Amino acid sequence: MEKMRVVLITLLLFIGAAVAEKAGNGKAANNPAEDASDGEHNLVEEAGGIGDAITPAEGKALISAYESARFKKFVTHCSSHVAQTCSGNDPLHASGRCHGINVPLGLSFCLFDSMEKCLGDHEAKLIDPNPGPMSAIPNSIQSQQLLIETVKFRTVLKTCTRVSAKFCLSAPNVDTSVLPACLGPSLNQCVYPAADAFTPGPPLELPPIIIMN
């Protein structure tokens, strides 16, 4: 009976995650630490910048809702890597959904896909929360907890890649040479906004773009 209860709860989680992703497509969550069902808002337009969207105090209070050591261990490393990849500075990986990085939607797709791949390379793979065959549903409490962690982190990551992409592409005089310097810190601050998890540096000063006639 207990096993059946776990299976049913897990199935509902799968379905709920899939519905939440479809309902929130193209938007950004009001706070990345909140549950996926809370809906999404455009943080950049409302707050004017990534630093105002999520304060360190808010992040520290809410971080326990979605933080997972399994993912956090590699996020900083992967953020730096995907920032290079998605800025077009890594020709070996500049393919597939990384095309169109000069627009927020294309850049956010690239950031999410590249982060997913990087985490997978470090054996911290994001499990796809979309419903699958009944035989594929985890049947243990441990698997259920892992699914919950993954769904929450996946939602946070989807939100933060959209926010970071729009924020960094809206910066003045942005080009591919300075884009990584914005994307890496912005993504880290959004995913883990607690003061002790990430300390932002001084405001980024972008060099002017010289147009040759």
Swiss-Prot record:
Keywords from the UniProt entry: Nodulation, Signal
Coiled coil location: none
Pfam families according to UniProt: Nodulin
Keyword Nucleus among record annotations: no
InterPro entries (alphabetical): Nodulin (IPR003387)
BP term (GO), one: nodulation
Induction and repression of expression: During nodulation in legume roots after Rhizobium infection.
Domain of life: Eukaryota
Disulfide bonds: none
Signal peptide span: 1-20
Family: Belongs to the nodulin 20 family.
Protein name: Nodulin-27
